[in-house]
Curated annotation (Swiss-Prot):
Subcellular locations according to the entry: Cytoplasm
Family in the record: Belongs to the metallo-beta-lactamase superfamily.
GO MF term (any one): metal ion binding
UniProt-listed Enzyme Commission number(s): 3.-.-.-
GN (gene name): baeB
Binding site for Zn(2+) 2: D66, H67, D140, H181
Highest taxon above the source species: Bacteria
Organism: Bacillus velezensis (strain DSM 23117 / BGSC 10A6 / LMG 26770 / FZB42)
Full protein name: Probable polyketide biosynthesis zinc-dependent hydrolase BaeB
Length: 225
């Protein structure tokens, strides 16, 4: 599908954590969106300056601190709108300036971009993926190599199963997937690669999925690269 924007990956660090944030920039419109900005604000503001774009909107996939901690600082600089699912906002009582609640399946315009929201609970109660043309931003719902853990308040492996089944059924194989973390694979792999290589996309029975996702003594859950 034709589009005029570019996707820029920004890897940020804080102690043991590494995250992938994304800037979606349309230089012809001098506009950009950030997805899950975190940890190192200079990396993000420097990239926006380099691209000569204004940060019109911030998309948050869920409310965990390592995905939202730069939302308000960036909003104060650029006066951006901030988007999150209404389910996530309500369950965790998330609050910040210029916060706009989204419903499932909503198509909306932000900064000149057309975006579709896809509610994908599992890792959190109201996780949300964002689809722009042929690019899907998944936060901690789907990684290239796996899916998000389901052990915190509001998490549900059953919900995660249904979210992944929904993604499998609705996202075309050519769409590129941009998660919030990596275990070694570069973000931006095509959906067809995940369908072939991500074990969570291959488990068809909910009971088997839940047992596998919640199995004991898992290692390397936070060994992000």
């Amino acid at each position: 599908m034709d589009h005029t924007y570019e996707v820029h990956q920004i890897k940020t660090y804080h102690q043991m954590w590494s995250n992938y944030c994304y800037i979606i920039a349309d230089r012809s419109k001098k506009s950009a969106i950030a997805v899950d900005p975190s940890w190192e604000i200079d990396k993000i503001t420097d990239k926006l300056h380099e691209l000569d774009v204004d940060l019109s909107a911030i998309l948050l996939t869920h409310s965990h601190y390592d995905h939202v901690n730069l939302a308000e600082p960036l909003q104060q600089i650029y006066h951006s709108d901030i988007y999150m699912s209404s389910a996530e906002i309500d369950f965790y009582q998330f609050r910040c300036r210029n916060l706009i609640a989204l419903e499932d399946g909503q198509t909306f315009a932000a900064g000149g971009f057309i975006i579709r929201s896809i509610l994908t609970p599992g890792h959190t109660a109201g996780g949300m993926c964002y689809l722009l043309s042929d690019h899907l931003f998944t936060g901690d719902t789907v990684f290239t190599e796996g899916c998000g853990i389901c052990g915190d308040r509001g998490s549900s492996a059953e919900d995660m199963f249904h979210s992944i089944q929904r993604i499998k059924a609705s996202i075309p194989p050519h769409v590129r997937v941009y998660p919030g973390h990596s275990f070694g694979e570069k973000p931006g792999q095509k959906m067809e690669s995940l369908l072939k290589n991500n074990i969570y996309f291959q488990i068809e029975k909910k009971e088997h999925f839940v047992n596998f996702r919640n199995r004991k003594n898992q290692k390397g859950l936070f060994h992000f690269k």
